[in-house]
Amino acid sequence: MKLKLVLPVLALAAAGAAFWPAAGGAATFKGIVVAKQHGTLLVTSPSGVVRAMSGRAAVGSRVAVSGRTVNVIGHAHTALVRGIVVRRVGTTMFLSSNRHLLAIHNARRLAGTATSTTAPQPGAVVETQVSVDNGDLEEQDEQEVGQANSSSIQVQATVSAVGVGTVTLNVQGQTLTVNLPGGLTLPASLVGQTVTISLSLDDNQGDDQNGDSSDESGGGGDD
């Protein structure tokens, strides 16, 4: 997977990371917290679309959001997530929903190659039913429902490391290392910053179980 564009000028301060509209009198939005990072909650709606907002709640919490106020109203053991498959490495799938990256695990993929070869590939739009356990998401069921309209997508992610020609993103404690165009090296000052980047959906890193060539130059890392 190649990083097509990095936009460091869009590094997001944590205080500005709430993307849910804050208009007065806004309708209440209800959903389930599926991830959190740096004071930002990722909340999936009943239709599976993930939204980001500032607040405090445990992963798995059922929340009601009105404006910028987040209230915990219960707890869920399962949730629905709809998004685009970005990459698979081992038993981890990286999914982009509404530009937000999620790391979803599936230990069942260790059982054999038949499962991994038939799994939806990068660029596929999927609806995934996940269980929530100790802050992690475990895939229970996955249905491919379409394909992305573009060969690249924009995502928001936190930079955990930079290397010569690579950048490593932190996705709920899992790392995703991708190539930079033309051997570009980013400044170390971006580490810990949340940035908006454009990722190619070409699955060419050579480090997963989807038939990639091991000769491909890729900053392989755990996704």
Task: Label each PLM-derived region with a short phrase.
Residues 2-223:
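Short, flexible, surface-exposed loop segments at domain boundaries
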